[in-house]
Regions:
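Short, low-complexity N-terminal intrinsically disordered segments enriched in polar/charged residues
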Residues: 20-70
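A mature extracytoplasmic/lumenal domain signature
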Residues: 71-72, 81-83, 127-131, 163
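Bacterial Sec-dependent N-terminal signal peptides
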Residues: 1-29
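Surface-exposed, charged secondary-structure patches
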Residues: 93-136
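Hydrophobic pocket/interface hotspot
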Residues: 55, 67-68, 76-77, 92, ...
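A short gly/proline-enriched turn/hairpin at secondary-structure junctions
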Residues: 76-87, 101-103
Length: 173
């Protein structure tokens, strides 16, 4: 009889424990698919546009240190210009400090037909320059195709590659 009572108590205790157990919540997490090639990334695109505006302003203000700060110089930094072999970050910084440090006046600093393509943490910016720069009395007009590759860093969007090619302008007929 004692065994039946013990068995019955254990059975009742087991039923109570099982019945009192809270239902576990099952939360489904829907995976968000990101299409790096086709998604527009509008917020990042706006950040890149603001970076480009700041780059332009720093050049026009003659703030060379600020202009240089938009570059992420590292062993990975590269630049192509004037059909010459690839430059590294050190050569790029030296060139930009020399050129923009020698400009006596900026008459025009237009970045035309700008296209910003964002691929997550990387952005490709293509544009046509129409820069009219004075070096003393000499006027230099820079019309070129420019490509800037930017990467999102803890300090914002920074240039990791530059490519400059001549822009062939068609004469008005």
């Amino acid at each position: 009889m004692k065994a039946k009572l013990s068995f019955t108590l254990i059975l009742i205790f087991g039923i109570l424990i099982t019945g009192c157990k809270q239902k576990e919540e099952h939360v489904e997490v829907e995976e968000v698919k990101i299409d790096l090639l086709n998604d527009d990334f509008p917020e990042a695109k706006q950040e890149v546009k603001q970076t480009m505006d700041s780059i332009s302003k720093s050049a026009q203000d003659g703030d060379i240190d600020k202009l240089i700060s938009f570059h992420a110089y590292s062993p990975k930094f590269t630049e192509f210009k004037d059909g010459q072999p690839r430059n590294d970050g050190e050569e790029n910084e030296k060139y930009e400090r020399n050129v923009f440090g020698s400009v006596s006046e900026i008459l025009k600093f237009d970045m035309n037909d700008m296209k910003i393509a964002v691929y997550g943490q990387v952005a490709n910016v293509t544009l046509h320059t129409d820069f009219h720069l004075k070096f003393g009395e000499d006027l230099v007009v820079v019309n070129e195709q420019m490509t800037l590759l930017l990467v999102k860093t803890k300090n914002g969007w920074r240039i990791v590659h530059e490519h400059h090619s001549p822009l062939i302008m068609e004469e008005n007929k």
